[in-house]
Amino acid sequence: QVMEGYEPVQGDGPLDFDDVWKRYEEMLDWVVGTYVEALNIIHYCHDRYAYESIEMALHDSEIVRTMGCGIAGLSIVADSLAAIKYAKVTPVRDETGLVVDYVTEGDFPIYGNDDDRADDIAATVVHTIMSKIKAQPFYRDAIPTQSVLTITSNVVYGKATGSFPSGHQKGTPFSPGANPENGMDTHGMVASMLSVGKLDYNDALDGISLTNTITPQGLGRTLDERVANLVGILDAGFVPDDCAEI
């Protein structure tokens, strides 16, 4: 048990979405509070013991302080909640009663495929966490921001985390940033871009990343084809529908 005062899901039957979401939000209150408290301590100690006087001497006189927070594993959380909501997820417990795995029956929407059912859950998770972050007191009245960025900790976190209702296995890396779960985006690059585009930037002003890889051969056979297809992908993923033609 990581912390006291939080009751686990009871019984061996299928998980109920509303019950899980309620418990998830309660747990987020503790996680966010502990996280922000740690950040406040870190920045206080940095100012006290390693103040960056040279850097601050070169800074603008009007200082706007921000506090960068971040989340990882967004796609796994979104897919797991979608599985609980739209499929049948039954927890598997060990001899102590601890949930160590899940049996998921039926289909469920997957984040990263331009499916509003899963994408809306992802956006709600980001918004909920940022709302809880904003409610915390910050060192030197810093303005809190949140990132959903590609960082190497997605590998470390995965090694220390158990299995999920989405099918993500214990000890395996999280997908980076706001990427869909590894291997779960089946509708192409543009669909994944459209899913990520549904995350509200106001909830993640520190940045949202989507890491995609494509070979030149995958874009087309000739240089002209590759240029045209790459432009088409960028236009489809980044140019709003109501944007005026340039």
Which residues are covered by each model-predicted region?
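Acidic, glycine-enriched catalytic cores built around paired aspartates
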Residues: 1-246
